[in-house]
Amino acid sequence: REGHAFDTALYPLPPWEPLKGFTLDRALVYAFMRQESAFKPNAKSVDGARGLMQLMPRTASFIGRDRGLRGHKRNQLFSPEFNVALGQKYLRHLMETDGVDRNLVKIAAAYNGGPGNLRKWMRKIKDKNDPLLFIESLPSLETRTFIRRVLGNFWIYRDRLGQPTPSLDAIAAGQWPAYTGLDANIKKAEILIKNVENR
C-alpha cells in the first residue's frame, strides 16, 4: 500500500482532457506530459516550447493547421485542453510516420529529437534489431534519457490504470515495443479502423 501511495503522488492522474476527448491511451499521453512539463500547464522552455506537452509554436502550427499559433495565438498553448489535444495529435502523426510504425522507442525519439534527426540516426545506426542497443547508440544524451523516462512513465501508468504492459514484455525479450490502444474507447475505435481498412 505504501508503494501505491508513492506512485499515486509521483504519477497522478491529471484532471485535464483534450478537446474532443482522448484519441490515444491516457497512459501514453500522461507519460509524455509527465516528462515534458511535470503537469505544469504554464511550463515554458528556454527554446519556447509551451504547455503540458511542451509544444513548439512551429510544431503546433503545423499539427493544428493554424499559422497564428506561431505568433499571436501562441499563448493558447498554455490552455491544458488545447495543448493536450494538439500533443496527442502530434503523437499520432509521429506514430504514423514512415519507419516509426507505432514503435514506442522511435515515437519518443522523434518527439524529443525531431523526426528529421530520427531519420538521420536510423540511417547511421547499423544494428536496428536490438531496441536497447538502438537507444544506447543514439548520439543525443538528452534523447536517450527522454526515451528511457517516457517508457518508464508509460509502464507505470499502464499499471496505475490496471492495464497489462505488452510493450514492457516485448523490450524485455529484445523485441521492439509497439503501441497498442488498451483504453476501452481507443481499443474499440482501432478495431473499427482495422475493419474498414480490411474491406
Go through the PLM ranges and name each one:
Residues 1-199:
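Catalytic glycan-binding domains that act on GlcNAc-containing polysaccharides
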